[in-house]
């Protein structure tokens, strides 16, 4: 009979629709689902679709006041995971009308909201999202993008070099500025505030900004190269964050920085809009990402966080090193590096890319390799990341036995040697160590660095790995 019928009914009756053909305007999601014992995959997949869109636990009278068929999420495909009895991939399509234009915050509140605490699921992980071009076009995206950044900096044909100032906490503003000057003077393109440097009692933000700007201008005058220091504008409120960005602009520096996950997507998008309007580049640090993305069965993969960042806005984002001290498997890392840089990325499950993604005209983001890397890694980094990357050596610069400027010189010489060798057709993967040794003959600074770090390795297996193929 027609009319309202109270009670609880199975999700799959409404939300599991294997016959559904996805639309170009749908947001598509791939979830790794671990259901509770006894919950069939169709019901679990439908529950994910329901709880992340229009559904609730019981039939409600007000369902009759809207068109559920128009607004509901749909689980349209379920795929087993090879070697995992209890896991499967559920594909869900969401109609575009469910999401506010230009708001990553709203998109995530639905797709990775309450559903992650749902009792019928033991664990849930969002592996990938397909953002339709209609939704992409509602975002500004990165303030400037890769080409505009190169033009602003007048640096072409090689990766950029950076250094995080250490110790990350405890230096006075003047000593901090001195380290910035020494690194930039030695040949680096950028230095960086650590992500946890905001405005603490030992160094207030305004003092740091002033001394870093002085260091930057002095290094520029002496080297004839454009230099940058990522001034961290992250703050406790959006108003304070913008105040710091305004002061950075008044100092005339080229780039500011934000911690986009701890700061939040609303704050990040606000800052990205300010940066485009005022000609500032925006460096993004991903502090807190491993809380969300490191476990293979629960949370959200970093490729989703990377896509969200490209939509929200940032010119650089940390993306792992493959070879350093932090988590990151090569194929997976290259998968999301492409998602950050390229306009069009084909589906490629061998690199963890579940959907073809078309970014239309959204600018690209430069991936930043940072964390436990040093001069011996330079050939591998140049080969893995190519030219459009920032290679950041914190301890690998400041840990040089002769001090900061020689540490910077060693990194710049190693990079120039690798780029030259690559351009001459040499294979960096097989000849890397030899290329670095040859360069040592012309650079005592590089030779000293090579001696210090010749035995350093971080050999641990990655936690987050690709699924085996059948």
From Swiss-Prot:
Lyase listed as a keyword: yes
Active site (record annotation): 166, 285
Pfam families: RuBisCO_large (PF00016), RuBisCO_large_N (PF02788)
Post-translational modification: The disulfide bond which can form in the large chain dimeric partners within the hexadecamer appears to be associated with oxidative stress and protein turnover.
Chain residues that bind substrate: 114, 164, 168, 286, 318, 370
Record keywords: Calvin cycle, Carbon dioxide fixation, Chloroplast, Disulfide bond, Lyase, Magnesium, Metal-binding, Methylation, Monooxygenase, Oxidoreductase, Photorespiration, Photosynthesis, Plastid
GO molecular function: magnesium ion binding; monooxygenase activity; ribulose-bisphosphate carboxylase activity
EC number, as in UniProt: 4.1.1.39
Entry similarity comment: Belongs to the RuBisCO large chain family. Type I subfamily.
Name of protein: Ribulose bisphosphate carboxylase large chain
